[in-house]
A protein has these predicted regions:
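Intrinsically disordered, low-complexity Ser/Thr/Pro/Gly-rich regulatory segments
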Residues: 1-305
């Protein structure tokens, strides 16, 4: 965990998050993968019919290391449904337990505007593309413990079909829960590309949604690429894990650091750091948010030479 997460672990202070900021991000987000004949992508915008915009919806989470980003994302989606006049959650986090064993868990069962009962699976992921990568397997998690291809296969081949199996249908009947008639997936997040060409790198024909949200990544030995250039000032914010979803939306009164402080802070940290970059051309101007990226400890050999 990053420095702010480590400090939270040491203090043991509960983590307070305004989920409205995460929901605002979600409503602007895109699926990581394109829809297929077997996978119907859930569109958060279709469920959002709030007549007034709320600015605050604070949830409290346990301190690190008990805090979980996935739980925060589930609560964000639940907040979306609570704001909807057309979509209603019937049940969430349904553990399928038989006499013999636990078969799995359904994230959400909801009813949509057409009175359909839908099984919805959720996942938010942040993957970076390895050097010279061209396949889904080359998108890996910031700590190297996860891969996009494995997650995609797990969701398609196991999680989504689960609600169509006889044991699960029987379990839902026993619990007096409606049987889903269709399945949807909300797999969103950000894909990060090597900083040098992060905006222009295109990986086609592997099923990615071409409109997915993207960012950059680099390793400690490459941080000089972030130096301000003549006529352009840069400032940065290092995000705690609980601000990874909403990003800049959480930074109402941002406490920015300059390039030197960024280098000092991130190179002392062996864990991945998510960073927001801000720019301005003149000192009397306000800094404008430009993009976000991941800074990683240099691996041997480096991911990028």
């Amino acid at each position: 965990m990053g420095q702010q997460d480590q400090q939270n672990h040491q203090t043991g202070s509960p983590i307070k998050v305004n989920l409205q900021h995460d929901l605002n991000w979600l409503l602007q987000s895109q699926p990581l993968m394109a829809a297929t004949p077997e996978v119907d992508n859930f569109q958060p915008q279709d469920a959002f019919h709030q007549t007034h915009i709320s600015t605050t919806h604070v949830h409290t989470y346990p301190a690190q290391p008990a805090y979980r980003l996935g739980k925060q994302f589930e609560d964000c989606v639940s907040h979306l449904f609570k704001s909807s006049s057309t979509h209603d959650i019937i049940a969430r986090n349904i553990v399928i337990q038989t006499a013999a064993r636990t078969l799995g868990e359904l994230d959400i069962i909801y009813q949509n505007s057409r009175a359909q009962i839908v099984h919805l699976e959720l996942a938010i992921k942040f993957y970076l593309l390895n050097k010279d990568g061209t396949q889904l397997m080359d998108f890996v998690g910031p700590t190297g413990h996860d891969r996009l291809d494995l997650k995609w296969d797990r969701l398609r081949q196991h999680q989504l079909p689960l609600s169509q199996t006889s044991p699960v249908i029987n379990f839902l009947q026993q619990q007096r829960l409606a049987k889903p008639t269709c399945q949807q997936l909300l797999l969103t997040g950000i894909l990060f590309y090597a900083y040098k060409n992060w905006q222009s790198t295109l990986i086609e024909s592997i099923g990615l949604n071409p409109n997915h949200q993207r960012g950059w990544w680099l390793e400690h030995h490459e941080l000089a690429q972030l130096k301000p250039i003549k006529g352009l000032e840069r400032s940065f914010i290092v995000l705690p894990k609980w601000h990874w979803i909403g990003g800049p939306r959480h930074c109402i009164e941002p406490q920015m650091i300059d390039y030197k402080e960024l280098v000092a802070r991130t190179t002392l940290d062996p864990w991945p750091n998510m960073v927001l970059m801000y720019e301005r051309h003149q000192s009397h101007q306000l800094f404008i948010f430009k993009n976000r990226g991941l800074i990683l400890a240099t691996k041997k050999p480096p991911l990028v030479s």
